[in-house]
């Protein structure tokens, strides 16, 4: 296995159509639509990019996938019923800015009834409250927990974990910003560079990202100071935008 190897877009699309024909031969009328997503769907694939496809099935509760490599290239094909796919497209979790971009750049390969457009419209029309709730959950479930971790490091170490924790905090901050602006990042590789270009960032976020993007993660004191500044910035930012986190006096149940 010496891959991935360099391939052209034309070579990838030839494989896509081969897979499409295989799907139609095997599943026949059970197939409603087939599309390509990811960099290949956006037409921004690089020489080593993989192939990602989705298949809308008429079978109720269909939900499975195939992921494989030939040793030279890799493919992932997700098979979902229309109901399951629409339900997922309408969900908003903390990682929505990274997971749901697939629904905004689907390249149809086979679509007998406009199903992929329906998926796109569903993802596009998610109600604002879901984003609000996801932001509040992200602050409690991830960022608050991370704050405890870096404060523990300040007191008792180990500082060896601080660089990777800083990267995690920067990524969580990017999800916060993406949810607030309701944008999906192009790729995981471009999350931070795209996040810092957004308007109305929490104070301290841009400075924190500069450490991560430059790889300057060896000075523990500077990292801890930057993390605290960002955490303070989040407090002011959430209050300004009305993201009220429920705080229980003791035990809420």
UniProtKB/Swiss-Prot annotation:
Domain of life: Bacteria
Function summary: Inactivates aminoglycoside antibiotics such as kanamycin by catalyzing the transfer of a nucleotidyl group from nucleoside triphosphates such as (d)ATP to the 4'-hydroxyl group of the aminoglycoside.
EC number(s) from the headed UniProt entry: 2.7.7.-
Temperature and activity: Thermostable at 50 degrees Celsius for over 30 minutes, at 55 degrees Celsius for about 9 minutes.
Protein name (record): Aminoglycoside nucleotidyltransferase (4')
SUPFAM superfamilies per UniProt: Nucleotidyltransferase, Nucleotidyltransferase substrate binding subunit/domain
Assembly information from the UniProt record: Homodimer.
UniProt gene name: knt
Lineage: Bacteria, Bacillati, Bacillota, Bacilli, Bacillales
Top EC class for this record: transferase
Molecular function as annotated in GO: nucleotidyltransferase activity
Keywords: Antibiotic resistance, ATP-binding, Nucleotide-binding, Plasmid, Transferase
Gene3D superfamilies: Beta Polymerase, domain 2, Nucleotidyltransferases domain 2
Any matching Pfam family: KNTase_C
Catalytic activity annotation: kanamycin A + ATP = 4'-adenylylkanamycin A + diphosphate; amikacin + ATP = 4'-adenylylamikacin + diphosphate; neomycin B + ATP = 4'-adenylylneomycin B + diphosphate; paromomycin + ATP = 4'-adenylylparomomycin + diphosphate
GO biological process, alphabetically ordered: response to antibiotic
